[in-house]
Design a protein with these regions (language model features):
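Short S/T/G/P-rich N-terminal loop/turn motif that feeds into the first structured element of a domain
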Residues: 1-47, 63, 68-69, 87-93
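A short, glycine/Asx- and small/polar-enriched loop/turn
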Residues: 49-52
Length: 93
């Protein structure tokens, strides 16, 4: 599997909406698309307008699998970017 970054800007009104989306995303990945999509982590962004966005790290067969996952889970996918390499300076907090 390849690693990807997915940008989801201003997609949620509040933390409760984000939690609901995360639960559905996990369900779709684990139950409907096992072996095709693997959610690694997300960084939550507070947008200027007060909404929440995310920078999500996934592993997937390809970008098409991530687009299908987003569609099934009802998630936006503003941008899907393949990761070329990783430079680790410090472990994540």
């Amino acid at each position: 599997m390849q690693t990807f970054v997915i940008m989801r800007r201003g997609a949620w009104e509040d933390a409760s909406d984000l939690e609901d989306a995360a639960a559905e995303s996990t369900r779709v990945a684990d139950d409907e698309m096992p072996g095709q999509v693997r959610w690694i982590r997300s960084y939550v962004l507070e947008e200027e307008d007060g909404t929440l966005g995310t920078v999500c790290i996934y592993q997937a067969e390809d970008a098409d699998a991530l687009m299908e996952h987003a569609q099934r889970a009802g998630l936006p996918s503003d941008e899907i970017l393949p990761v070329a390499n990783t430079v680790i300076v410090r472990d994540d907090p």
